[in-house]
Amino acid sequence: MNNLQTQFPHIAIKLNEPLSKYTYTKTGGEADVFVMPKTIEEAQEVVAYCHQNKIPLTILGNGSNLIIKDGGIRGVILHLDLLQTIERNNTQIIAMSGAKLIDTAKFALDESLSGLEFACGIPGSIGGALHMNAGAYGGEISDVLEAATVLTQTGELKKLKRSELKAAYRFSTIAEKNYIVLDATFSLALEEKNLIQAKMDELTAAREAKQPLEYPSCGSVFKRPPGHFAGKLIQDSGLQGHIIGGAQVSLKHAGFIVNIGGATATDYMNLIAYVQKTVREKFDVELETEVKIIGEDK
């Protein structure tokens, strides 16, 4: 597997790369092989090679809603951060997989295009956002998603239309079929820039007031259980401020777990499990994780 550097001398490849550099929690073990394609063609080459040689392949976006275990990830990590182009086509925006959702929302603002205001504070990449149908404050990616270019796990390039991109709460066809997002097309609407800015300012203020942005975190840890709010259940269970190792249930918003210093992925997972157990015993409600947990135990 280490011969990928010989096989693809034109592609940036690192061995035994610490993944804590790429996650918002600042935790995670090492990647055996860490690949950073600069073009869609390079990404396609690597995906096809991994499929042909039965090498495990993991896609890494912005690392924002993700916990990578302390034992790291075997096989190849494909990091799409260098695919960041954002372009306008009439009232549509085409953003590549590695583009930040926040930057895409800002681009829409600069172009006086409305529809992505809800995304102005979501820290993920376009690829990750499509994968989990990211959303906030009443908006979801699927509301404005028109089309996507993806790679299958065999390296086949596919164009998906809106009708093929089924989505629900924190779910998408892309996740179901394990597609690799290369770009996304969003259909937006012309609007006065000052009105778009006002909406973004309102949402940013709400986010800053409620969320613990001063600490590393993976964002909202749990999905919203039917008929409940995860943060309220955790708070009413007396868990706000609870600490395991360097991980803490946020004092600002109980739906977040923050790294208050030196946390490991194991600390995060132990605290998540403790929260789930406590809420289950107290309220008979099962908290399902929204954050994605991947990798191997140490």
Swiss-Prot record:
This protein's UniProt keywords: Cell cycle, Cell division, Cell shape, Cell wall biogenesis/degradation, Cytoplasm, FAD, Flavoprotein, NADP, Oxidoreductase, Peptidoglycan synthesis
Cofactors required: FAD
Residues annotated as domain FAD-binding PCMH-type: 27-191
Pathway: Cell wall biogenesis; peptidoglycan biosynthesis
GO biological process: cell division; cell wall organization; peptidoglycan biosynthetic process; regulation of cell shape
Pfam families the UniProt entry points to: FAD_binding_4, MurB_C
Residues annotated as catalytic: R170, S220 (proton donor), E290
EC annotation from Swiss-Prot or TrEMBL: 1.3.1.98
Subcellular location: Cytoplasm
Principal location class: cytoplasm
Gene3D superfamilies in UniProt: 3.30.465.10, UDP-N-acetylenolpyruvoylglucosamine reductase, C-terminal domain, Uridine Diphospho-n-acetylenolpyruvylglucosamine Reductase, domain 2
Reaction(s) the record says it catalyses: UDP-N-acetyl-alpha-D-muramate + NADP(+) = UDP-N-acetyl-3-O-(1-carboxyvinyl)-alpha-D-glucosamine + NADPH + H(+)
Keyword Cell cycle listed: yes
SUPFAM superfamilies: FAD-binding/transporter-associated domain-like (SSF56176), Uridine diphospho-N-Acetylenolpyruvylglucosamine reductase, MurB, C-terminal domain (SSF56194)
EC category name: oxidoreductase
CC per GO annotation: cytosol
GO molecular function: FAD binding; UDP-N-acetylmuramate dehydrogenase activity
Its job: Cell wall formation.
The family this protein is said to belong to: Belongs to the MurB family.
This protein's name: UDP-N-acetylenolpyruvoylglucosamine reductase
Organism expressing this protein natively: Listeria monocytogenes serotype 4a (strain HCC23)
